[in-house]
Every structure is written in structure tokens, then in C-alpha cells.
């Protein structure tokens, strides 16, 4: 029916034509975030064709595109996670490729949330179809609170107890366990753990503890060292341990960047990797393949992560359960076997 038709069309008529519920039509006409941009645009087109009065919203993203996505990085330990971090760059690239495959635009927001109000601001000030938060930081309960609203969002991060929001992340517990078991099987007895205190790193630490117990090794509190997410923090921490004559023959790092910082400190002290100390990382960034020695690490599937994060925003699906991606041990030169 063209623009010359009468204006007696009802919400029920639009719902029947669109093959959706009346409530979905109502939400779409009010541009509510729980409805995907594709569904909104289909309902808006029907409303226009049938002269149904509504506020004409501009589509998010390029004309004809499926929508747009905003990417937000919360504060980590009191400051924004740097977008220049190699893993963040790889994850952003995967999100971008997945968005392009769906003819969807994406933007990286300047907002770095530290509390619930910041999360609300991030999800309500954007014209995007939804928001991808990179990491939970200390915002798990605030994200649970946000999930009770109409905000459309997904989190890259750990699965947490009592979680009510959708997340995509890797099996951090298994990844930490695999890295530690590998060192134990190589005969390493005094294995140092270096990691930040964000939820993902803490799960990797739990895997480290499980593997030590499974290998009959006692966990030494002196060998569990919190570090920042930058390589400089790891280099400084390992340097201090060496100067204090704390003995260790293996390192499980919660990221590749932390592992590379540790290797710098070992080299400055005249120690050989892997001759004196075997080192494992986590992420399998490009740098891990280019370093000397090349880095044994735990691979996260960022390509699949990007695809799932984008689909959780754009697809009308009731299957918004958290997704746990497998991790793989990638053995290279830094462990010597």
C-alpha cells in the first residue's frame, strides 16, 4: 500500500504485517534499544507506507546499514584501559571485521565508566543500536543493575557469579591451568604468577592455583605478584624479586604484554629464557610470534569473539546466554619445549 492509503492502520495491523508482537511494534516506533535496528527499520518502513503517524528516527549508521555499535572501555584500576594495548587493538579489529560483514558501523566512545551512572550515560547518549563494554573492571554489580533496564549491551569479559547480563569471554580458568601445568610438566617447581586484579586475570590465577595443587606443588604467596596491565609494571616487579633473591624458575603471566615485560627484567639480570626461567603469556598477540624468544602463550579466539559480540547486539534472539570460548596452549621458544 502506498502513501495514498488511508490512515486507519492500527498497531495490530502493523504487527500482523511485520510478523511480530504489538509490543515489539510499539517499542520499535519509540526507538527503544531492545529492538534491533533491522527490525526497527522494517517496522518504520511499514508505518510510513501505511501512513501510521510516528516520530521518524534517523537510522544509526550509514543509510542502508544494519545499525551501529558503540564500544566502551571501562576504567581499569583507576584509569582508562589504553586503546593502544595490543590485545585491545586485536579485539577492536575483530569487532570491526564482524561489523563490516553485517554492514554495520562502529565507534569507539570517549566515555570510560567508573560507576553505574557512567554506564547509563554510555548506553543512553549514543544513537547506536547497542554498546559493547570491553571488560568488567569493578563494575560487575553495576552491570547487573544495568541489565534490569532496557539498555542493549554485551560485555567482553569473565563469567561472574550471579551474572544477569550477557557476556562473551574465554575460559580463563582453563587457560591459567593449562599454562601452569605445561610449566610443571617441564619440571619447573617454583612458578611465579604475574597478573592484574581484573576479573579475567583473577580467574587465570585460580587456574594457576588449581594446576599447582594438581601437580603436587605448594603455592608460595611470595610468588603471586599483582602487576598492572602494562609491560613496565611486570618488568619492575620481576626486577624487584630478582634483587631480593626470590627464587623462581617459571613464570605464568596473565597477558602476553606482562610476559614480555618479565622477559626484559630477566635479560637485564643476565638470566636466560628458557634456560633459567620458562615463561608463558596469555592472548597470543602478534607480538608473541615476533619476540625473541617467541612466546609460549594461551590463545584467545578474538575472531570468534568479535563475531559473537556483534551478533549479540544486532540479532533478535532469546539466546543471550554468556558465551565461553575455548582456549589453546601455543608452545613456542620461551618454555624450551
Predicted feature residues:
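Alpha-helical recognition/docking segments in bacterial nutrient-uptake
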Residues: 1, 6, 66-181, 243, ...
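Flexible loop/turn connectors
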Residues: 239-337
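A short helix->loop->beta-strand "cap" motif at the edges of active sites that frequently abuts
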Residues: 149-153, 189, 274-277
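N-terminal helix-turn-helix DNA-binding module of bacterial transcription factors
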Residues: 1-65
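Residues that mark the start of a beta-strand
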Residues: 68, 188-190, 249
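Hinge/beta->alpha junction and helix N-cap segments in small-molecule ligand-binding domains
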Residues: 77-90, 108-116, 167-178, 194-239, ...
Amino acid at each position: 500500500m502506498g502513501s495514498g492509503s488511508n490512515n486507519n492502520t492500527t498497531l495490530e495491523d502493523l504487527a500482523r504485517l511485520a510478523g511480530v508482537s504489538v509490543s515489539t511494534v510499539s517499542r520499535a516506533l519509540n526507538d527503544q534499544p531492545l529492538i534491533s535496528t533491522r527490525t526497527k527499520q522494517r517496522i518504520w518502513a511499514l508505518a510510513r507506507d501505511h501512513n501510521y503517524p510516528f516520530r521518524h528516527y534517523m537510522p544509526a549508521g550509514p543509510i542502508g546499514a544494519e545499525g551501529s555499535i558503540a564500544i566502551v572501555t571501562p576504567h581499569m584500576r583507576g584509569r582508562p584501559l589504553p586503546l593502544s594495548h595490543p590485545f585491545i587493538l586485536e579485539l577492536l579489529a575483530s569487532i570491526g571485521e564482524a561489523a563490516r560483514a553485517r554492514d554495520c558501523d562502529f565507534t569507539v566512545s570517549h566515555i570510560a565508566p567508573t560507576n553505574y551512572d557512567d554506564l547509563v550515560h554510555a548506553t543512553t547518549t549514543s544513537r547506536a543500536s547497542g554498546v559493547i563494554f570491553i571488560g568488567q573492571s569493578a563494575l560487575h554489580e553495576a552491570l547487573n543493575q544495568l541489565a534490569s533496564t532496557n539498555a542493549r549491551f554485551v560485555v567482553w569479559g569473565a563469567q561472574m557469579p550471579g551474572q544477569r547480563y550477557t557476556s562473551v569471554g574465554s575460559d580463563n580458568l582453563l587457560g591459567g591451568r593449562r599454562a601452569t601445568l605445561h610449566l610443571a610438566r617441564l619440571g619447573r617447581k617454583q612458578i611465579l604468577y604475574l597478573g592484574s586484579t581484573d576479573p579475567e586475570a583473577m580467574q587465570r590465577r585460580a587456574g594457576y592455583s588449581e594446576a599447582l595443587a594438581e601437580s603436587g606443588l605448594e603455592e608460595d604467596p611470595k610468588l603471586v605478584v599483582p602487576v598492572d596491565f602494562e609491560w613496565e609494571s611486570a618488568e619492575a616487579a620481576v626486577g624487584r624479586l630478582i634483587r631480593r633473591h626470590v627464587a623462581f624458575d617459571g613464570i605464568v603471566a596473565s597477558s602476553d604484554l606482562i610476559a614480555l615485560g618479565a622477559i626484559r627484567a630477566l635479560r637485564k639480570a643476565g638470566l636466560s629464557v628458557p634456560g633459567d626461567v620458562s615463561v608463558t603469556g596469555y592472548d597470543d598477540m602478534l607480538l608473541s610470534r615476533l619476540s625473541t624468544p617467541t612466546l609460549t602463550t594461551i590463545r584467545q579466539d578474538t575472531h570468534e569473539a568479535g563475531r559473537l559480540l556483534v551478533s549479540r547486539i544486532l540479532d533478535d534472539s532469546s539466546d543471550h546466554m554468556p558465551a565461553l570460548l575455548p582456549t589453546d596452549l601455543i608452545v613456542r621458544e620461551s618454555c624450551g619445549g
